[in-house]
Amino acid sequence: MVTWRLPWRNGSQNASRPEPGDPGLRPLVSGTDEAVPSSVALAEAGFEDDAPVVLRHLLRVPQAELAAVSERCISHGYVIDESVATDVVDGLALLPVAQAMVVDAVALSRERARMASAVSRAGGRVEGWVLLRAADTPVTR
């Protein structure tokens, strides 16, 4: 059975939207294995929240493709997360991108696929993803 949680019925639309790069953000759930489905990762972490969180992707991209991949991510509403230290490993630069959004298994799957597609076309790889929220944010269900 599918249940829908409507944001205007539980007050989560009033939840303050977290800002990518905010140093007060704390990790809720993360993943580095592309084979683990989003629904499994969220279920194992017990994540069921209707409030916006920050979804951060850590991408490894060839330096020559960094500008093109950054532009592609920005066109999908992401920002470059400058709170993460970047480095270059095996010729691949770390590109941390983040976006504040309401996340469920479908949304997370869609965004993970979008990022995987963007970096694979550029000859890079996804290093991982993480959901972040301010430590003092109440959980809404």
Q: Each predicted region: which residue ranges?
A:
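Long, contiguous binding/interaction regions
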Residues: 1-141
